[in-house]
């Protein structure tokens, strides 16, 4: 019996996502044996500093990629928003699964919405993208760092450390915690991270058998959207060091891409949007990136 070993982070959300991919693989290939290889990454272990300060979201991938290179795993499953814009050789993304809700969720035990927060309320997030949009919408708020997995962050809220926190809707709902969401933060006022809500499979792109095995899990509609978002981010040379947000949505046969570059320090933001054929998401992403740069985003990117 053929076996596929999936490298995964140990967090509850990462394990859920990897088991979801494993289930899809078993359904598509009856008789295939799929097992998880849980691993800890530096991004999971260092929680006293922001991701930007310790090297970025790529920290969540490196140990999993090394496991594949060592022959300890055949593939890895990631939240696509954590995957760098450029993959190292020989890696590829053969499958981007159907996207979950890409929105951010406003979570609070006391207040029903962002607007309902009192002046000076404490909001937890370590995401520069979320901080930038919070600064733009509510410059009076106290923004406090918040690291850890979903359950850890909720526990910190429940223990009174924050008046509200912002988390991805997809992560909460995948863990059965959707009832904690009191409001969705949605376009056009609020934009998510590029590829937020999407799960991707990474493997050796030169391994034709693995590439074919995962191809059936790929969702073309999701891939078109996230490729536009990632193309925009790539053209801006965006990373977790810079507040960049993007969301592509279907509009008939076309994609409508909205993008934002912000400042986490003072709430300044530059926005742009465009519609283009879904058959060429890369061009659409590059177009919106150019519009952002032409509107002054370069000044924020170089801060």
UniProtKB/Swiss-Prot annotation:
EC number: 2.5.1.61
UniProt remark on cofactor binding: Binds 1 dipyrromethane group covalently.
HAMAP family referenced in this protein's UniProt entry, alphabetically: Porphobil_deam (MF_00260)
Pfam families the UniProt entry points to: Porphobil_deam (PF01379), Porphobil_deamC (PF03900)
Functional description taken from the UniProt entry: Tetrapolymerization of the monopyrrole PBG into the hydroxymethylbilane pre-uroporphyrinogen in several discrete steps.
Domain of life: Bacteria
Subunit structure: Monomer.
Residues carrying S-(dipyrrolylmethanemethyl)cysteine: 240
Reactions catalysed: 4 porphobilinogen + H2O = hydroxymethylbilane + 4 NH4(+)
Pathway: Porphyrin-containing compound metabolism; protoporphyrin-IX biosynthesis; coproporphyrinogen-III from 5-aminolevulinate: step 2/4
Gene3D superfamilies, A to Z: Periplasmic binding protein-like II, Porphobilinogen deaminase, C-terminal domain
Note: The porphobilinogen subunits are added to the dipyrromethane group.
Family from the record: Belongs to the HMBS family.
GO molecular function, a single term: hydroxymethylbilane synthase activity
Annotated protein name in UniProt: Porphobilinogen deaminase
GO biological process entries: protoporphyrinogen IX biosynthetic process
A GO term from the CC aspect: cytoplasm
Cofactor: dipyrromethane
């Amino acid at each position: 019996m053929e076996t596929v070993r999936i490298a995964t982070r140990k967090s509850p959300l990462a394990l859920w996502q990897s088991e979801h991919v494993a289930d899809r693989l078993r359904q598509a290939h009856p008789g295939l044996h799929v097992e998880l290889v849980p691993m800890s990454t530096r991004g999971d272990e260092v929680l006293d500093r922001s991701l930007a300060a310790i090297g970025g979201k790529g920290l969540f991938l490196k140990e999993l990629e090394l496991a594949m290179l060592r022959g300890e795993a055949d593939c890895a499953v990631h939240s696509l928003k954590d995957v760098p814009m450029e993959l190292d050789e020989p890696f590829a993304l053969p499958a981007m699964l159907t996207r979950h809700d890409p929105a951010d969720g406003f979570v609070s035990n006391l207040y029903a919405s962002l607007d309902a927060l009192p002046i000076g309320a404490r909001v937890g997030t370590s995401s520069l993208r979320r901080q930038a949009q919070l600064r733009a919408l509510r410059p009076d708020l106290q923004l406090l760092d918040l690291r850890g997995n979903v359950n850890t962050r909720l526990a910190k809220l429940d223990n009174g450390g924050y008046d509200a926190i912002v988390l991805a809707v997809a992560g909460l709902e995948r863990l059965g915690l959707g009832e904690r969401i009191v409001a969705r933060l949605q376009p056009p006022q609020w934009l998510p991270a590029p590829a937020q809500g999407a799960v991707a499979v990474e493997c050796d792109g030169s391994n034709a058998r693995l590439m074919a095995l995962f191809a059936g899990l790929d969702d073309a509609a999701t891939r078109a959207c996230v490729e536009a978002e990632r193309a925009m981010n790539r053209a801006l040379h965006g990373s977790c060091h810079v507040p960049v947000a993007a969301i592509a949505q279907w509009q008939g046969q076309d994609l409508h891409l909205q993008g934002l570059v912000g400042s986490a320090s003072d709430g300044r933001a530059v926005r742009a949007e465009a519609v283009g054929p879904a058959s060429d998401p890369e061009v659409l992403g590059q177009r919106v990136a150019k519009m952002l740069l032409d509107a002054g985003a370069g000044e924020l990117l170089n801060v």
